[in-house]
């Protein structure tokens, strides 16, 4: 199972948009996909409930309480043969709260919004992330996503300058568009929209999808696989 964690301690960074977009992509690709919504607000679950029966199927689970529990009775039962697990996390996570999430994942995607206040909060979160043993030892690979970006804007230039100092680059730069809101209201993702108008938006995600495909093909040791299994198992 390939586990993708979407996290940022800053609220409003677009975690749910990233989660549902990727869920739509993997489901459309025929992968057995499960969405684990660990945010008490339940936005990803709401999106899933709105999804029309005729769309590519995917499974969704409310996981806020169980993922933080350590008892065997709290094991989350994922659908059998789940191939891709997407974990949507709540805002405001502190170090001791985020660590259990990091142990569940193969990759971490950090969405960010290019505004001074949002960037400041995200930098604090990245500092937390880069201190994790999973990241330092290469067990958890990290990439960034610039959300609601308007190219050639002052905010975009400030984002690039900040990332250059961090020696980090964004896997993708998602343009600012109302299309995501309109699709979400119908339980759809960008990859459910075959219109010509949506093609440039889908192209925004190509670099990230290629990066994820490479990460999924990377070999994982038995020890790493055991750590990642954590309180998640297949029913």
Report the location of each language-model feature.
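P-loop/Walker-type NTP enzyme "switch/lid" segment
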Residues: 3-13, 24-99, 103, 184-188
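Inter-lobe coupling/hinge region of RecA-like P-loop helicase motors
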Residues: 182-201, 206
